């Protein structure tokens, strides 16, 4: 995760880029080559970039209610920092110092943690940037090609300011479109699968446990993947309200629908990740790992290692959430999570 000595530097940089590309293009480049209607649409889209960006910065991601009590038959997650129980899919944000509902990641470019409540605002910002900069990039490509075809004409026929800005803005707009586009695709793919970036990392860790035969394949299945459109609507709300600056996600960020892999044959809910063990507020295990699995209606062999000694203990420690890295070298802390929950 990118960090800055002053976190607001991460906000100032995008502001400079957005202002420079949108303002100078609308004044010096586009008026000479597009209709007034197109120019108006570009200005409106640029305004939506600013509006969605400001909202993504100021709207909090959502935190559990102070009086939250976990269900008796559900998983019990306890945050040592907040000294309180928290719902499933909730993590403690190191930057904000609070637990965040359905935390996705901490974004240095908004200086905000992305969670259940502000995910639609964050996604709206990405989409508006992609559309606005994508349009500008296409227009710049057309303009540069025309300048190349007319390169033999006298220089006094060209507006030098426009030519210089077009040449500079072409690679700049491509860079913005490429980097933001990759992030948009990553977030959208996760959204389609009903998963957050943190949970995607968690799935990679669980898959490594399956390969080492520490967790069974049945227990490794992700329980929150319901159906394509349901997953999308749960994350960003209705497609009609998504385009409104105040559009909200579905649900409360506390309880979530699960697929069949999230329940036992008797209909009892299973915890995820499967190697989670319930703890009480005094940070004392309610019981050892195998007893905890039995209490949740699972077979102890789904975690073949358990809490043992020697080599197996070292292996289990390696796969713990605060130690493990994925193939890209990312740890849980790289998503802005302060590992204080047990």
Curated annotation (Swiss-Prot):
It comes from the Eukaryota. Residues 77-127 form the DHHC domain. The DHHC domain is required for palmitoyltransferase activity. Residues 30-38, 146-162 are lumenal. One of its GO terms (biological process) is protein targeting to membrane. This is Palmitoyltransferase PFA4. It is a multi-pass membrane protein. The keyword Acyltransferase applies. One of its GO terms (cellular component) is Golgi apparatus. InterPro entries: Palmitoyltrfase_DHHC, PFA4, PFA4/ZDH16/20/ERF2-like. The chain crosses the membrane at residues 9-29, 39-59, 125-145, 163-183. It is found in: Endoplasmic reticulum membrane. Mediates the reversible addition of palmitate to target proteins, thereby regulating their membrane association and biological function. The active site is at 107 (s-palmitoyl cysteine intermediate). Keywords: Acyltransferase, Endoplasmic reticulum, Lipoprotein, Membrane, Palmitate, Transferase, Transmembrane, Transmembrane helix. It is an enzyme of class 2 (transferase). GO terms for molecular function: protein-cysteine S-palmitoyltransferase activity. It catalyses: L-cysteinyl-[protein] + hexadecanoyl-CoA = S-hexadecanoyl-L-cysteinyl-[protein] + CoA. It comes from Yarrowia lipolytica (strain CLIB 122 / E 150). Residues 1-8, 60-124, 184-342 are cytoplasmic. Belongs to the DHHC palmitoyltransferase family. PFA4 subfamily. Its EC number is 2.3.1.225.
């Amino acid at each position: 995760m990118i960090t800055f000595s002053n976190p607001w530097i991460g906000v100032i940089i995008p502001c400079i880029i957005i202002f420079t590309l949108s303002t100078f293009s609308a004044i010096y480049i586009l008026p000479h080559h597009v209709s007034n209607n197109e120019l108006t649409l570009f200005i409106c889209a640029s305004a939506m970039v600013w509006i969605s960006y400001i909202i993504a910065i100021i709207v909090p991601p959502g935190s559990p209610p102070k009086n939250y009590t976990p269900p008796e038959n559900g998983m019990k997650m306890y945050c040592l920092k907040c000294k309180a129980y928290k719902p499933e899919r909730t993590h403690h944000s190191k930057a904000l110092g609070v637990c965040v509902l359905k935390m996705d990641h901490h974004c240095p470019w908004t200086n905000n943690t992305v969670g259940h409540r502000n995910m639609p605002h964050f996604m709206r910002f990405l989409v508006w940037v992609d559309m606005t900069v994508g349009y500008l990039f296409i227009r710049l490509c057309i303009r540069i090609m025309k300048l190349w075809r007319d390169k033999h004409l006298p220089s006094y026929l060209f507006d030098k300011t426009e030519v210089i800005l077009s040449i500079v803005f072409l690679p700049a707009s491509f860079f913005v479109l490429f980097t933001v586009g990759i992030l948009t695709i990553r977030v959208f793919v996760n959204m389609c699968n009903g998963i957050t970036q943190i949970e995607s990392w968690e799935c990679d860790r669980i898959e490594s446990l399956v390969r080492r035969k520490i967790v069974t394949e049945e227990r490794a299945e992700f329980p929150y993947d319901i159906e394509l459109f349901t997953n999308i609507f749960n994350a960003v709300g209705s497609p009609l309200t998504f385009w409104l600056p105040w559009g909200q996600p579905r649900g409360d960020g506390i309880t979530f629908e699960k697929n069949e892999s999230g329940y036992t044959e008797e209909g009892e809910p299973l915890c995820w990740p499967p190697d989670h063990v319930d703890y009480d507020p005094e940070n004392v295990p309610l019981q050892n790992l195998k007893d905890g699995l039995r209490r949740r209606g699972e077979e102890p062999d789904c975690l073949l290692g358990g809490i043992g000694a020697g080599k197996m203990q070292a292996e289990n420690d390696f796969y713990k959430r605060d130690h493990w890295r994925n193939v890209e070298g990312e740890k849980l802390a790289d998503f802005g999570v302060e590992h204080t929950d047990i």
